[in-house]
Amino acid sequence: MSESLARTERLGLVEVFRSLGPSAPTLCEGWRTADLLAHLVLRERKPVAALGILVPSLSARTEQLTLELASDFEANIRLFESGPPSWNPMRYLDALVNGSEMLIHHEDVLRAQPEWKPRVLSAQAQQEARRILRGAAQLMTRGAKVKVRPDPAGALTPANGEVVIRGDEV
């Protein structure tokens, strides 16, 4: 069996981090590549500290730890490349839950570069991205003024037929 979207996107991110270095821009407002990498390492290595991503009252501590982690870019690349540690359940769920996180953050880095061009995902990666999109469509569009649902091909179309959003997921 070939590697999961989470694994291939993780390895792609590692390659991009290594080639761009710690100071390259990202689409994550206010973050450079070192900051984004620190965020990813924090999620996997210090999950309790990462709660500030979801819990506003803990966000200051999470932000502080992210800044501290961002100082050792090369060590963070090695940690991130190895995936979640064995004590973290995410290590065993990586393929199921991290595909979207890795894909989105890989695009956050790639699209922030002046020479960015859309990339072509493998058929397997596209299929996995569609599966993720179908599962997340309602959550991602809950505030939309139109009703949105995934159509059989994986694109999003509104339930009432007024607006159509189509195209590659990436």
Q: Where does each model-flagged region fall?
A:
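Alpha-helix boundary/capping detector
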Residues: 39-43, 62-66, 131-132
